[in-house]
């Protein structure tokens, strides 16, 4: 791990913790059981799939916990008052980009085979989260 990647990881973690806090402060009054199950499943699926994607890597355990931060943010987004199909689903897609990135480090052996899919899911997820946040501000006025 280089100093640059460690600093990037800290910035990543801080930004997602901050976003998770914002979502947690804006929880929907009532969520259905299915929404709760979806929110609970995202962190579990993220960690398990990351662990599997990193097989053969020397940092499997530590790095498989990395998406737990973004997945926790996604779970709070799913449960929040922000539009579910923009912010919640967008955050879940964003988490998928983290898992795809880790797959490139692990089972894909830095092949870059899923590079475009990784970046596309990152951009689409981020855009959906941003659009959900923007529409929430418009709806609240």
Indicate where each model-derived feature is located:
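Polytopic alpha-helical membrane-helix bundles and their juxtamembrane interface segments
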Residues: 1-141
């Amino acid at each position: 791990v280089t100093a640059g990647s460690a600093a990037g990881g800290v910035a990543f973690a801080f930004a997602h913790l901050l976003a998770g806090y914002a979502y947690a402060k804006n929880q929907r009054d009532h969520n259905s059981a299915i929404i709760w199950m979806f929110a609970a499943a995202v962190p579990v699926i993220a960690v398990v799939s990351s662990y599997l994607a990193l097989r053969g890597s020397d940092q499997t355990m530590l790095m498989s916990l990395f998406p737990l931060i973004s997945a926790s943010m996604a779970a709070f987004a799913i449960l929040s008052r922000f539009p579910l199909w923009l912010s919640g689903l967008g955050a879940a897609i964003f988490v998928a980009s983290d898992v795809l990135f880790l797959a490139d480090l692990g089972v894909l052996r830095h092949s870059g085979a899923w590079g475009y899919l990784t970046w596309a899911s990152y951009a689409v997820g981020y855009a959906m989260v941003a659009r959900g946040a923007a529409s929430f501000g418009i709806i609240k006025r």
